From Swiss-Prot:
This is Ribulose bisphosphate carboxylase large chain. The keyword GTP-binding does not apply. Substrate binds at residues 116, 166, 170, 288, 320, 372. The keyword Magnesium applies. Its cofactor is Mg(2+). Its EC number is 4.1.1.39. One of its GO terms (cellular component) is chloroplast. The record marks 327 as: Transition state stabilizer. The basic functional RuBisCO is composed of a large chain homodimer in a 'head-to-tail' conformation. In form I RuBisCO this homodimer is arranged in a barrel-like tetramer with the small subunits forming a tetrameric 'cap' on each end of the 'barrel'. Mg(2+) binds at residues 194, 196-197. Transmembrane segments: none annotated. It catalyses: 2 (2R)-3-phosphoglycerate + 2 H(+) = D-ribulose 1,5-bisphosphate + CO2 + H2O; D-ribulose 1,5-bisphosphate + O2 = 2-phosphoglycolate + (2R)-3-phosphoglycerate + 2 H(+).
């Protein structure tokens, strides 16, 4: 009898895990994988192998399979389609039952879905293109500490994108000189300045000194401008305890916002910090250092839209999202696709924008996308048009590279932004008339004119 019930040995995954007749449930987590099978491996077997290895499967039949209800717990490859324009690439859709995942843990979700399967022999390459997070699962996450509307209310800034600047040179400044640069930028008209992602607590500038001098700069700039200012104090550290210590010190200083590198720091640390930020009224700026290691290859790894969705669940109020212009160019439609996934409550499936599933966030707060990297005043009309009001535009070199100094660089950016917003509100077409709008603004802002002269060729 045993030989009938339990047949030892290796069997094809597709017999168990490829189920084209399966109707997906509202509670399933759905994944779209770009699969490149090894030569000779059928697409169905490759898709089923992904479903198996990222859920209940192992490479051989085991006795203990009989002690569980495989039908309840297994991942299922329910649809496969050939990837358009690519040879030997397929999009495999996999449904995972919700019971496979721990509530409120992005870490566990990724360990399950992408933890093991990417080294699989039968696959030449594998890329996770998108995830559909069911309402039942997203409701177990707190999400962003505050969200877009609460942030605007805290800062008292409406009807325009926010302006930021990463302090450069990113490594080597003393805390006092660093604070001075922060003050000059904020005084000139920026809303935020930013620690670079790799500024943590190095020998030339320990974190506590930086926090103190930056707080002084913030309060001085606020007093002089009458506007609320912030500096993203990077709390990223070698241990979670040290990270929380830094966040607590920022709160004691009374500053509005801290920062975290969520991929190098890890999702567990990020979610911990996000909970602290909500409980203590701190905004949380997220940098995506290390993302290109994961998302740059077109056929292997994970698309950034998956990392962006994961961040919205784990928690963050801002996240870097590419620029569409500048030095880190992203494809426009794809970028806007995941920008909407970050900001909006309900996003329709739209394959032309890389969105494989309709996503309903059921009122989870939104995240402000941050455009940063090689941008300057001439890009302002395009950025305003592409990203709209709910965004942060960050000019590092585009502020600090101004020939007259940091404060005039900040003035130039603020004038350019205000000119673009006003022109848009008057009904002008930023895409077509952008350069003209900037040139007109130069007439009443010498600082902007000087900036335009420096970067006119770029």
């Amino acid at each position: 009898i045993a030989s009938v019930v339990f047949k030892a040995g290796v069997k094809d995954y597709r017999l168990t895990y490829y189920t084209p007749e399966y109707e997906t449930k509202d509670t399933d987590i759905l994944a779209a994988f770009r699969v490149t099978p090894q030569p000779g491996v059928p697409a169905e077997e490759a898709g089923a192998a992904v479903a198996a290895e990222s859920s209940t499967g192992t490479w051989t039949t085991v006795w203990t399979d009989g002690l569980t209800n495989l039908d309840r717990y297994k991942g299922r490859c329910y649809h496969i389609e050939a990837x358009v324009g690519e040879e030997n690439q397929y999009i495999a859709y996999v449904a995972y039952p919700l019971d496979l995942f721990e509530e409120g843990s992005v870490t566990n979700m990724f360990t399950s879905i992408v933890g093991n399967v990417f080294g699989f022999k039968a696959l030449r390459a594998l890329r996770l293109e998108d995830l559909r997070i069911p309402t039942a699962y997203s409701k177990t996450f707190q999400g962003p500490p505050h969200g877009i509307q609460v942030e605007r209310d805290k800062l008292n800034k409406y009807g325009r994108p926010l302006l930021g600047c990463t302090i450069k040179p990113k490594l080597g400044l003393s805390a006092k000189n660093y604070g001075r640069a922060v003050y000059e930028c904020l005084r000139g008209g920026l809303d935020f300045t930013k620690d670079d992602e790799n500024v943590n607590s190095q020998p030339f500038m320990r974190w506590r000194d930086r926090f103190v001098f930056c707080a002084e700069a913030i309060y001085k700039a606020q007093a002089e401008t009458g506007e609320i200012k912030g500096h993203y104090l990077n709390a990223t550290a070698g241990t979670c305890e040290e990270m929380m210590k830094r966040a607590a010190f920022a709160r004691e200083l009374g500053v509005p916002i801290v920062m975290h590198d969520y991929l190098t720091g890890g999702f567990t640390a990020n979610t911990t910090l996000a909970h602290y930020c909500r409980d203590n009224g701190l905004l949380l700026h997220i940098h995506r250092a290390m993302h290109a290691v994961i998302d740059r290859q077109k056929n292997h790894g994970m698309h950034f839209r998956v990392l962006a969705k994961a961040l919205r669940m784990s928690g963050g109020d801002h996240i870097h999202a590419g620029t569409v212009v500048g030095k880190l160019e992203g494809e426009r439609e794809m970028t806007l696709g995941f920008v909407d996934l970050l900001r909006d409550d309900y996003i329709e499936k739209d394959r032309s924008r890389g969105i494989f599933f309709t996503q309903d966030w059921v009122s989870m707060p939104g995240v402000l996308p941050v455009a940063s990297g090689g941008i300057h005043v001439w890009h302002m009309p395009a950025l305003t048009e592409i990203f709209g009001d709910d965004s942060v535009l960050q000019f590092g070199g585009g502020t600090l590279g101004h020939p007259w100094g940091n404060a005039p660089g900040a003035v130039a950016n603020r004038v350019a932004l205000e000119a673009c917003v006003q022109a848009r509100n008057e009904g002008r077409d930023l895409a077509r008339e952008g350069n003209e709008i900037i040139r007109e603004a130069c007439n009443w802002s010498p600082g902007l004119a000087a900036a335009c002269e420096v970067w006119k060729e770029i």
